[in-house]
Amino acid sequence: MQHTTFHAFCIAAPRSGEGKTTASIALMRALARRGLRVQGFKCGPDYIDPTFHAQATGRPACNLDTWMMGRDGVRALWDSRAHDADAAVCEGVMGLFDSRDPGDPAGGTADCARALGLPIVLVFNGRGMAGSVAALVAGFQLHAVRMGVRLVGAIANNVGSPRHADILRETLERSNLPPLLGALPRREEWRLPERQLGLLPSEEAGTTAAWLDALAEMAEQHLDIDRLLALTTSKRPEAPAPLLSENVPPPAHGHRQRQGLCFYYEENERVLRSQGMGTRSRFPPLADYGPGRHSA
C-alpha cells in the first residue's frame, strides 16, 4: 500500500568518515520497519554502499552521478526508482561540497542534491565538540545557500552522553540554525568494517538482519525521525514512460559475481531487462563453471 505522503532527503557530511553510511542505513531500516517503502540511492560511482542500502530496504539501490549521467540523467533515474516508494534516501559521497574538480561541482553531493531539489541533513562527528558546532553548521548552511541547496537539519555522531547531546542541540537552537535531529552515541558494534580503500562489501562484512534491526532501533531511540519526515515532505516523482524494447524472445544473460568480483551498477541490469534481456544468473568465475548457457 502506497502512503499518501512522500519524503526525500540527502544524508551528507563535512568529509568522509563522519558516519553518514551508518546513519543512512539506520534511517532506511527504521523507515522500512515503520511500513514505508524505502528507496536507497548513493551519490557517485560507489559499488559498496548500495549493497547495504539494499539489505536495509529490501529494494535494489542505485547510483546517481551528475558527472557521468548529467543532471537530466540523474533526474530520470530518480523518477524511475522513487516514484513507487514512500521515502527516498540519498547518501552523499565524501564531503557535501567535494567534487572531482574544485571549480566544477559535477559528481559531488551538493550537485546531485541541487539537481533533485533534495533537502540535506548533515551528519558530523560530534566527538570533543560543544559550542563550535554553531560555526560548523553555520558555515555549511551559508555555503549551501551559495550552492543552491538547502540544509534542514543535522545529526551528531560519536556523542559521549545525553548531556553532550543537549549542549549541541541547545547551541544550534540559540544560534537560530538548522536543528539537531538526533545524536548517535559511541558504539563500536555499530561501526561498519573497513579496509584500505573503504568499507567492506556487505557480503564480506557479514551484515545480518539482526544487526540492521539494531541500527534501526538505535535510530528510533536517538533520532527525531518524525521531525525529520516533517522537514522532508516532497512531491512524489511521476512514473516515467517505459524504455523502448523489442518484442523478441529474451536471451539469458549472466555476470560474474563472487567475492572480489561483485561490483556492478544495478541500473545497468534494469536497462538490460527493459530491452528484452531475460533471465539473469550469477556465476562464480573462479569455480569450474562458465557462462556457456548464456547469450551474453
Residue ranges and their predicted role:
Residues 69-72, 186-192, 286-289:
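A short acidic, often aromatic-flanked loop/helix-cap motif at beta-alpha or helix-coil junctions
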Residues 250-296:
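Phosphate-binding active sites in nucleotide-utilizing proteins
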Residues 2-116, 120, 124-153, 160-166:
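ATP-dependent carboxylate-amine ligase catalytic core
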Residues 27, 31-32, 172, 272-276:
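Hydrophobic alpha-helical packing residues
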Residues 44-45, 94, 158-159, 185-190, ...:
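Glycine-rich beta-alpha junction loops
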Residues 56-57, 116, 175-177, 274-276:
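Short, structured coil segments at secondary-structure junctions
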Residues 130-245:
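Internal gly/pro-rich beta-alpha loop/helix module
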Residues 4-7, 246-252:
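A short, charged/proline- and glycine-enriched loop
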